[in-house]
Amino acid sequence: RPVRDPAYRPLLFYCIIGGLTGGFASPFLSVYELRVLGLSHTFITSVGVVSAVVGMAGSWVWGRLADRTAWNCVIWLTAFLNLSCTLGWSFVRPSFAHLVAPVLIVVAAGCAGGASLASTNLQFALSPESGKTAYFGVTAAMSSIATCTSAAVGTAIQPMLEKSMGDSSISLLFFVAGIGGFANLIINGRKLPSVT
């Protein structure tokens, strides 16, 4: 039913395509940070702690912004920042990774809570009173399947690319994921209704 619902379908497609683009490079982030960029476990863990705090604060900030604007506005802003971070990973090099990586990690974490809040609120607002659980379930299932499928494809492609591109193969995956995410935001994100 969610697929056939014209009011809900733009959000469903946005979530599914977002899963496809989001899952493509995400399995490689830790490998990229450690093996390619040469960041230490201690460094990554320390930045992870900071990003967790920023993520909690981000949820509050994005919620306040949604109160003043609309949830689709929060999705656009958080997606823009998060996709900029994804794309940014493709340009990070070991010589300046210790300066740029924390920014990318913290900004992405700060956006995660807002994106989740916005998506959940849009799903709630756009689904019918009698079918909210089914709509939420279908959206979560289809997005998860898309994310897992995309991760599997990325994992299959990366070793083949590595033979000719070396460590740049992971950078290419981040680039493709970022561009695909921006395409989704431009094509499907603009169709999201304004809901407060």
Write out the residue ranges for each language-model feature.
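Short amphipathic helix-loop junctions that connect adjacent transmembrane helices
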Residues: 27-44
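A membrane-interface helix-boundary motif in multi-pass transporters
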Residues: 158-180
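Hydrophobic core of transmembrane alpha-helices in multi-pass small-molecule transporters
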Residues: 98-115
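Juxtamembrane intracellular "pre-TM" segments in multi-pass secondary transporters
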Residues: 1-12, 196
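C-terminal ends and interior cores of transmembrane alpha-helices
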Residues: 80-96
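Helix-to-loop junctions at the C-terminal end of transmembrane segments
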Residues: 58-71, 158, 162
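Multi-pass alpha-helical transporter architecture, strongest
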Residues: 175-196
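Intracellular juxtamembrane helix-capping segments at the cytosolic ends
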Residues: 114-128
